[in-house]
Amino acid sequence: MKHFIHGLSLALILAVCSGFPAVPNSAHAQTAQAVGSNTGYPLPRYVSIRNAPAHLRLGPSKAHKIDWTLMHAGMPVQILDEEGLWRQVKLYDGLRGWMHKSLLVGARSLLVFSKGRATLHSKANGDSRVVAYAERGVILRAQECAPRWCRVRKGEIKGWVSRRQVWGVEANETFK
């Protein structure tokens, strides 16, 4: 039986980040891997929002104005820089700001970002059985990513999605 996953609509996501154009993620082709000055973890890297609401600030302290309030726990963000307890993050549409590290968690999630809907397959192969469809804007829990496919979960539904259909993983990144 095929499932259709309903979730965040594009309109809800854009309500959070309206007015900001999408920015391609091409500025990170570096020869040497940068690491965070506080954690020693690679930069850039992806994490998820721990709980909602989560405040995105103009700078790395509570003294800086809240620029946006993000309402979706689990949404992937890309950490670009670290300053003390603060992380400079980028959202799927290119919007940047600072978040306290307590608002972030290392669990990986992916945002369906393809035109239309993403197809979840039973195997990491486009010819395998379709197990579900996920609308644009749905947040999927990433379990592993191979060179072209990521194994994901949404509730009890599990499958493989093409990396071309999601945002939240570097081009050459693999993990289990």
Could you tell me what each predicted segment is?
Residues M1-I5:
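Positively charged n-region of N-terminal signal peptides that target proteins for export
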